[in-house]
UniProtKB/Swiss-Prot annotation:
Component of the PAF1 complex which is a multifunctional complex involved in transcription initiation via genetic interactions with TATA-binding proteins, elongation and transcription-coupled histone modification. Ctr-9 is required for epidermal microtubule organization during morphogenesis. It comes from Caenorhabditis elegans. TPR repeats lie at residues 143-176, 177-210, 212-245, 247-282, 320-353, 355-388, 432-464, 471-504, 594-627, 643-677, 679-711, 712-745, 748-781. InterPro entries: Ctr9, TPR-like_helical_dom_sf, TPR_rpt. The lineage of its organism: Eukaryota, Metazoa, Ecdysozoa, Nematoda, Chromadorea. This is RNA polymerase-associated protein CTR9.
Length: 1150
């Protein structure tokens, strides 16, 4: 409003009219020397001054900062002012709005919440009273809308109410500045900065005074939009208008701080200092000065300034920044409890929007060892600042070392750590600490990448820091190499780690370290030595490994892993007794170790000692795990024990059901404990297959293979089920796939299985090859030999049964029968070789019978061999005969092709000779007209031609021809021009046919065109080039009246240079014509026609009317115009319609 508290024009005097004065008598109150409040009240009351004068006097006191008198006058005006005049309602509303605005301003500035609420309540009462007088007055709505902005924290819809009222005021009074500023403020708080700038600029244009705060608002909008140059310009402009504007100084100082320039930083600090001197409680100046003194190590001074900023301000974001500065000061002083307190307040002050507060609070949580809370804080920072490398490094390290109660959550944290550290190393690839953390996280999931990171960290330590890697790091590198089966490199790193650790322990510093940390250092050394022995074991240097294990258990008798490895080494040497002794020694040191009891149980299981093995696994379940959480491995092992007893040939029949139930029970228990236990599921499938439930067994095995394709046994079991279901080809495929996938090409057992499948599928050659591969590994296996003989016998029998067989096939079958006979006789006569490795006995009687059958087949094979040889001989003779006939036919075809080729060559030669003779004849014909031309040049033909051509009006070139000159053009050029003219004439004929009126005219034109072309062709054959160039075409004279009679007519014997000032053109160029010319004269398009003097009319006319070139003669360039007709409306149709007549002048060529 124009008379608002901030926008009232200053007056030097206030004139108050005297009571009952008929003249203009007034009492003047000097504004520079205002009297006391009581005196002014007496004057106003005595003269019964109007309410408007009370308001003016009160505002003047407010301008002079005498607020008490201002309030006293306005509050007294309601009951003591004169109200009997027109427009008093408006003044009453005005007085209420001024009072409400005062209380509104006081409430906005008040820090105490209770007082703030009281001030706003008083303003609300006054505004409600003013609403009863004139609710929709624009000045009242403006002030009330600003009141909504001031108390916006009480209700969420205050912005909407204020915006609605501002919109109404702007529509009612568009030039009012206050609603424009209010809309700009609302748009700024809604983060619609472009709209805010629009309203700020509009307010500046409407404002009668230059207000610096509007420029400050524009600067803040540009800063929020990231347009720092424009923001800087706005703040500088505000300071030009008002040099002591604190907000402009602070805004400009913040921009200068972000330039990171030394001079700019000094200027920014000076601006903040000036702001502080002008307004000591300005929070922005206080905060930035606190930040400045913090970096100058004046911590207490920085903390004091930050404390004042937090005390003198109610803005949540500024309070959060102030608390953060206070927490940082306490953090730098080592007062971590105080730092935690202020960081926490900074986070809570602005609803967690202050990012750096989360960072500092996370550091305090790390100091308190509250890793999970620290992870939450740094995770928040990382989401808001995803490219901050410091946050990524700290967060990744926290994820790498946190230990959560839930294993799934721990695994998830590890994965997040991998992601964060990987992103960090992509930016900072020279941080060895991050490399080590990420390498530790990747040891189990990506050993190759982990190894690269470890090696990179070692290189960075050696090159950048000149620090030798620690033994623990070298040990980890060796373990990774060993997991990747690079045992030589693993051995190298284990030895380096061992030497490095021993070197540290032998030094004086290392000795002190050993006294302080003797147990960890010894354990590290034992671990490195154990890993080195394990690596040597993988390198097949078992003697060295065994000695190292013995040294380890001797030095540290309680190192149970050494006993386990010694037991395994002796077990692999088939020294079962010594293996059991080592394992029993391990049991002495650790009675509750399930691994030791498991290895002992496996020893009994390997020796088919079912009862001892059963007791060991039952001991593990009952004593070690107390039947609370059973060991899945022991359950599966017990199931295997019961199932193996089913396969024992000496088992009792009545115990079969008990074994099946117990084995199935153990497998099911293990599967319930570990639903993904493939060994338990495979055991259930084996029990179902034993019960001949082939479909169910196949389903179980298939599910196991779907879950993991690296389980070799399940592939074999699926193939076995296919064999039992007589699916021979499927079994062959499964056996072959398992052999390729698991690289079992040299496995004799698998080859034996495959051979059986081939045999069942009647693929005898493949079965023979598979058995041969199997026998290479087990030469003493009687069962393999027997099966090989069976295959040889059956293969030979199949050959002998065939109707068509060669002598080679019969000979091979005889050899197979002989070898099979030897195998059967060998097995039947040797008692010590008649049992297979599975314990299954091969009957000698059957072998003897098979040998006898082989001999019978050999007898039959001799007759088959003779017949096969006879048949082979006949086939050989037939093949020779066919080959001879084939060769004779090929020779005949070659001879025919040669004769045809010679005939073609002769034909081409004849055609070539004929063409040469034709060319010679043509040359004679072409020379003949030149001789005639020479004779005629001296005769009377020239005179006759000149006489006949008197009617032509020629250009200079044509005139030269009539004089016997060539006009500077040779014969070759004239020939080319004639060809061009002929082509253009043919094109014009086509257009005339297309534009002509009916089919009769088309036929007549076509006939004339053909006759003319035939005549031209004959003429060209008779005349030479020079003669052809001298023949002139016929011209026609149009009788059209469309040409201009008043134009001068060119002389027939004058040249183009004299008549037409235009540059000379070629006689084939087309004159420029209008569209009307094209409509009436299609025959003259792109051609020049010679104008002819008509003897009857004595006038020269062009080829059409209305043309721009009617004053020039149209030169015809064709010599066959006797058949041309004017096109369009100027020609006569076939039905005899009238048209302008043309007089045809024929040349001597006709």
């Amino acid at each position: 409003m124009d008379e608002s508290i901030d926008d009232v024009q200053e007056t030097r005097t206030i004139a108050i009219p005297l009571k009952d004065s008929h003249e203009d008598e007034v009492i003047e109150i000097n504004c520079s020397e205002l009297p006391d409040g009581e005196e002014v009240l007496q004057i106003l009351e005595a003269e019964e001054a109007k309410l408007s004068y009370w308001i003016e006097v009160a505002l003047e006191y407010y301008r002079q900062d005498r607020v008490d008198l201002f309030m006293m006058i306005l509050e007294s005006a309601g009951s003591r002012a004169g109200l009997e005049y027109e427009g008093v309602k408006q003044d009453q509303m005005r007085a209420l709005d001024i009072l409400a605005a005062y209380w509104m301003t006081q409430g906005y500035r008040e820090k105490a919440k209770d007082k703030k609420s009281d001030f706003f309540s008083k303003a609300t009462v006054l505004f409600n009273t003013a609403d009863k007088i004139a609710m929709y007055e624009w000045s009242h709505l403006t002030v009330r809308a600003w009141f909504y902005l001031f108390e916006r924290d009480k209700s969420t819809n205050k912005y909407e109410l204020a915006d609605q009222q501002f919109n109404y005021v702007v529509k009612t009074n568009p030039k009012n500045v206050l609603p424009l500023i209010g809309k700009a403020v609302i748009a700024f708080n809604k983060k619609d900065y472009k709209t805010a700038i629009y309203y700020f600029r509009k307010a500046i244009r409407q404002c009668r005074h230059t207000i610096a705060d509007l420029r400050v608002g524009i600067g803040h909008c540009f800063a929020k939009m990231g347009m720092m140059d424009k923001a800087k310009t706005a703040f500088e402009r505000a300071m030009e208008i008002e040099p002591y504007n604190v907000s402009a100084m602070c805004g400009l100082g913040i921009i200068l701080l972000n330039t990171y320039d030394h001079d700019s930083l000094k200027h920014a600090v000076s601006l903040f200092g000036r702001s502080y001197n002008l307004q000591t409680d300005h929070p922005v100046a206080l905060i930035h000065l606190a930040n400045h003194f913090f970096f100058k190590k004046e911590i207490e001074r920085a903390w004091t300034l930050a404390w004042h900023a937090a005390t003198y301000n109610d803005c949540d974001s500024i309070k959060a920044e102030a608390f953060y500065q206070m927490g940082r000061c306490r953090h730098a002083q080592g007062q971590f409890d105080g730092a935690y307190k202020y960081y926490y307040q900074a986070r809570q002050a602005n609803n967690g929007e202050h990012t750096l507060a989360h960072y500092g609070l996370g550091q305090m949580y790390i100091h308190r060892n509250e890793i999970e809370e620290a992870i939450k804080c740094f995770d928040t920072v990382h989401k808001r600042l995803p490219n901050n490398t410091d946050t990524m490094k700290i967060l990744g390290s926290l994820y790498a070392h946190v230990q959560l109660n839930d294993p799934a959550q721990t695994a998830e944290a590890r994965q997040k750590g991998r992601d964060v550290l990987g992103k960090y190393l992509a930016v900072e690839n020279d941080d060895y600490e991050a490399c080590i953390d990420l390498a530790q996280l990747l040891e189990a999931t990506d050993p190759k990448r982990s190894l690269e990171l470890y090696e990179n960290a070692i290189d960075l330590l050696v090159t950048n820091e000149s620090i030798q890697p620690q033994p623990e790091m070298l040990n980890n590198v060796g373990a990774l190499y060993m997991s990747m089966k690079q045992y030589e490199k693993a051995e190298h790193h284990f030895k380096r780690a061992k030497e490095r650790l021993e070197e540290q322990l032998n030094t004086d510093e290392g000795s002190l370290l050993l006294e302080r940390r003797s147990a960890p250092e010894k354990s590290h050394l034992l671990t490195i030595r154990y890993n080195l022995a394990l690596c040597l074991e993988h390198l097949c240097r078992t003697v060295e490994a065994e000695q190292m294990y013995k040294d380890i258990v001797k030095e540290c008798p309680g190192y149970i892993d050494g006993y386990l490895r010694l037991g395994c080494i002796t077990r692999d040497r088939h020294q079962v007794y010594e293996s059991s002794l080592w394992l029993k020694q391990g049991v002495q040191f650790d009675q509750a170790s399930p691994i030791v009891w498991t290895l002992i149980g496996n020893l009994h299981f390997a020796k088919n000692e079912w009862m001892p093995a059963q007791k060991k696994f039952e001991f593990i379940l009952s004593k070690i795990f107390n039947n609370k959480i059973p060991d899945p491995y022991s359950l599966v092992a017990l199931g295997n024990v019961w199932f193996e007893q089913l396969l024992n040939p000496s088992r009792k029949k009545e115990d079969e059901k008990k074994y099946i139930d117990r084995a199935l029970q153990m497998y099911q228990k293990a599967l319930k404990l570990q639903p993904k236990n493939m060994y338990a599921a495979n055991g259930i499938g084996c029990v179902l297959a034993y019960k001949r439930n082939w479909n169910d067994a196949r389903d179980v095995f298939s599910q196991v293979r779907e879950s993991t394709s690296e389980f070799y046994d399940v592939w074999l079991n699926i193939a076995h089920v296919c064999m039992e279901r007589e699916q021979w080809m499927a079994a062959v495929q499964m056996y072959s796939s398992a052999m390729k996938k698991f690289r079992k090409e040299n496995d004799s057992t698998l080859q034996h299985y495959l051979a059986k499948a081939y045999y069942r599928a009647n693929m005898l050659n493949e079965a023979k090859e598979a058995l041969e591969c199997a026998m290479l590994d087990q030469l003493d296996n009687t069962q393999l030999k027997f099966n090989y003989a069976i295959v040889l016998k059956k293969s030979a029998k199949e050959v002998l049964r065939g109707h068509k067989m060669t002598s080679e096939q019969v000979t091979a079958a005889i050899d197979d029968l002989k070898f099979a006979d030897k195998i059967f006789q060998y097995i039947s006569k040797n008692d010590d070789r008649q049992s297979s490795h599975t314990g299954m006995r091969i009957s000698r009687t059957i072998c003897a019978e098979e040998a006898k059958n082989c001999k019978d087949l050999l007898t039959q094979a001799k007759h088959k061999l003779a017949a096969a040889q006879t048949q082979d001989e006949e086939e050989r003779r037939l093949m020779e005969k066919q080959e001879k006939e084939k060769i004779a036919l090929q020779n005949k075809m070659i001879e025919e092709a040669r004769a045809k080729e010679e005939a073609e060559k002769q034909k081409l030669e004849d055609m070539k000779n004929l063409r040469l003779s034709f060319i010679e004849m043509t040359k004679d014909v072409l020379r003949l007209p030149e001789i005639v031309e020479e004779k005629r040049r001296g005769g009377g033909g020239r005179k006759r031609r000149n006489d006949d051509g008197d009617e032509f009006v020629n250009d200079s070139s044509d005139a030269g021809n009539y004089d016997g000159e060539e006009g500077g053009e040779d014969g070759e050029r004239r020939e080319r021009r004639k060809k061009d003219k002929a082509a253009k004439k043919a094109s014009r004929k086509k257009r005339e046919r297309r534009d002509s009126g009916g089919p009769d005219s088309n036929r007549r034109d076509e006939k004339k065109r053909k006759r003319k072309e035939e005549r031209d062709r004959k003429l060209q054959e008779k005349l030479s080039a020079k003669q052809s160039a001298k023949i002139k075409s016929r011209a026609f004279l149009s009788s059209s009246e469309s040409s201009d009679d008043d134009k001068p007519k060119p002389a027939a014997d004058s040249s183009d240079d004299e008549v037409d000032p235009r540059p000379p053109v070629d006689e084939f160029d087309s004159p420029t014509r209008t569209d009307s010319d094209s409509d009436r004269e299609t025959t003259t398009k792109k051609k020049k026609k010679k104008a002819v003097v008509d003897s009857d009319e004595g006038s020269v006319s062009g080829s059409g009317s209305g043309s721009d070139n009617d004053d020039k003669p149209i030169i015809g360039g064709s010599d066959d115009d006797d058949d041309d007709k004017p096109a369009g409306g100027n020609s006569r149709d076939s039905d005899g319609s009238d048209a302008p007549k043309k007089k045809v002048i024929e040349s001597d060529s006709d």
